[in-house]
Amino acid sequence: MNISLIKSKLLIAILVISTFLTSCASKKDIVYFQNAKSFETIVDTDTFKAKLKVGDIVSVYVSTLDQTVTQPYNLVRNTGGQGELIDYLIDVDGNIDYPVLGKVKLLGLTVEEAKNLFKKKFADGQLLKDPVVIFRVLNFRVTVAGEVNRPGVYPVSGERVSILEALGLAGDLTIKGRRDNILVVRDFNGTKTYTRIDLTNKEVFNSPVYYLTQNDYVYVEPNNSAISGASGDARIGNLITITSFLITTALIFITRN
């Protein structure tokens, strides 16, 4: 009987079993858009635009050919010798207190709708002729937490950001992040909604939370492999020890007979 050959085979068996016990993740747990076919076209018909909320901080800049007539609207504060355009907080009633116009209700409007509202008010009151209105949300940010490489709060410069873009800002998911059950927490005027999204399915593009709104919270939970690793390292170690013991016992029995 070739004892060396038996020892080699048993050693290989131990290594294979150890690898099997410690490797739980599979391709289907990691790859995005798994049911998307090659060269398949998905038309983005979503015209989603974030709506203004209570607590949003906005800036409104008005311009006309005659800049002198817009000065009462473009109030500035002096910061270090430089003029900085004053911003406005949307109050609990959904209004801002704007120069000359007074209370302006912005709650629930998109940025474009807010621009048009100001233009209409200037026109109706015969205050400005053909004004250009630049309206921005200054505190548009999203929070990404959990199993991502760079969790944190990320400012957004545009009018909308997709969940994929937000995860990209956070350095993408770690290998331990669960891709099929990402949680998006959204707060609109005190009412919170909780929506799950599956990045492994191409239908993610049709999700109502594919495009995020200001102050959305994105949480990536750990996958089963990570959970098992956190709570089951000792258990796996015990299984490996027991397996090794049984194989060693078998080896001793074989060599003695």
Where is each model-derived feature located?
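Ser/Thr/Pro/Gly-biased, low-complexity, turn-/loop-rich segments
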Residues: N2-I6, F20, C24-N257
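Bacterial N-terminal signal peptides
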Residues: I12-F20
